[in-house]
A protein has these predicted regions:
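Short clusters of small/polar residues that mark proteolytic maturation junctions
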Residues: 19-20, 57, 308, 339, ...
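Flexible loop residues that form catalytic
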Residues: 85, 240, 343, 353
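Active-site-proximal beta-strand elements of phosphoester/diester hydrolases
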Residues: 192-196, 306-307, 346-350
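Cysteine-nucleophile active-site neighborhood
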Residues: 233-234, 238-308, 313, 357-375
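Catalytic beta-strand/loop cores that center a nucleophilic Ser/Cys/Thr
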Residues: 301-343, 379-383
């Protein structure tokens, strides 16, 4: 039996379609993702906390879901919107359908609306607060709820997704996450990396482990002394959800550790590192979400196609002199990468682990290892 569901935006726009997930009512910031595949990774990425995701590709769910392509233990997004949900999972790895997976995990989902019209409205007017409901179907009521709902600005969503206790990571990349012919390289040097988890995707830790690193995952609320107790060779700053500026505890910790350890940050970790250096961030009009974002490497001149998922960016107009722009997003020329002039610290505003997405930027993990090696074995004087 088809169940009616509605999406109401704070500007008064209402879309009516059918539910294919759980029953209920949720609020969130309505955004869009341009990826053609990788929906299971998107669903389980903690960075999507507080958001209602619209997929721009018209047919989603073709290959079902499985037990391997997950980036955390459960979905974290508020709601999910597609043009058409494929009820038939046509893949030998599938263990179930997308709709059943969403219903099992309590995710409200909507199909059958004009997603092109919705995405165009977001692109023109910017990301908006919205309500997705299978219960209240009154347009005026839903719009009023959307207007009064919380947005992302000023909210600390990190505390809602971080682990409760430290984890000694012991899992490497699965065969499906590797490039053809790629094997776990290991390393001639065993580095101990502490990863501050602000909502980390599991494949990031798997990449570090695959390179031979010992990885200790600490909750994002860990202090500098908590980190140093583990005597790490390097500090990794993970991705995570929402506005970076309210995450003041992490900004303070990073600022204390940057003079002492090599640092590599991605996505939210990139923004937090910049804030720790005295920079500021701002909210993008509709964000960067998708596996096809072009980025220019300022040093090499090469263009890298990257996977991105963020609604905030570092403000170049307030960038301190000790930070250097290393990468730029070619769609809007915003900062996509930074490095510190004095300390072995760098960061990027995208996902080099490519789960899902292109593999153009995997070299950044090797760069992190090289920085740890350089600190461990400093160049003798006179060379």
């Amino acid at each position: 039996m088809t169940r009616t569901a509605k999406l109401a935006l704070e500007d008064g726009t209402v879309f009516t379609g059918s539910s294919f997930g759980a029953s209920g009512e949720v609020d969130g910031e309505v955004v869009f993702n341009t990826s053609m595949t990788g929906y299971q990774e998107i669903l389980t990425d903690p960075s999507y906390r507080g958001q209602i995701i619209t997929m721009t590709y018209p047919l989603i769910g073709n290959y079902g879901v499985n037990e391997e392509d997950v980036e955390s233990a459960r979905p974290h997004l508020s709601g999910f919107i597609v043009r058409e949900n494929s009820r038939r999972a046509n893949n030998f790895r599938a263990t179930g359908s997308l709709g059943d997976y969403l219903e099992k995990h309590g995710i409200v989902a909507l199909e059958g609306i004009d997603t092109r019209a919705l995405v165009r409205r977001i692109r023109t007017s910017g990301a908006m607060k919205g309500i997705l409901s299978t219960e209240d179907l009154d347009d005026k009521s839903l719009v009023a709820k959307a207007k009064s709902s919380q947005g992302l600005v000023g909210r600390d969503l990190v505390r809602e997704v971080i682990p409760e206790s430290p984890i000694e990571w012991d899992e490497q990349l699965s065969s499906w996450a590797k490039l053809p012919g790629e094997v776990s390289s290991g390393s001639n040097e065993s580095f101990h990396v502490v990863a501050l988890d602000f909502g980390m995707k599991w494949n990031i830790a798997r990449h570090l482990a695959d390179l031979g690193c010992r990885v200790t995952v600490l909750p994002g609320i860990a202090t500098a002394s908590d980190v140093l107790e583990h005597q790490p060779d390097g500090l990794f700053l993970s991705n995570g959800p929402g506005d970076p500026e309210p995450v003041t505890y992490a900004i303070e910790t990073i600022g204390q550790l940057m003079p002492q350890l090599p640092v590599f940050g991605i996505c939210l970790g990139h923004q937090l590192m910049a804030l720790a250096c005295g920079a500021r961030t701002f909210k993008l009009k509709f964000g960067h979400r998708g596996a096809n974002q072009p980025v220019l490497n300022m040093e090499t001149g090469q263009v890298e196609i990257t996977a991105q998922n963020h609604g905030f960016a570092v403000d170049e107009e307030q960038l301190p002199d000790h930070l250097v722009v290393t990468h730029r997003n070619l769609n809007d020329n915003t900062i996509a990468g930074l490095s510190h002039r004095k300390f072995p610290a760098f960061s990027v505003q995208y996902h080099p682990e490519a789960s899902s997405g292109p593999h153009d930027s995997r070299y950044l993990f090797e760069q992190f290892l090289a920085n740890m090696m350089a600190v461990r074995t400093p160049t003798p004087a006179g060379r």
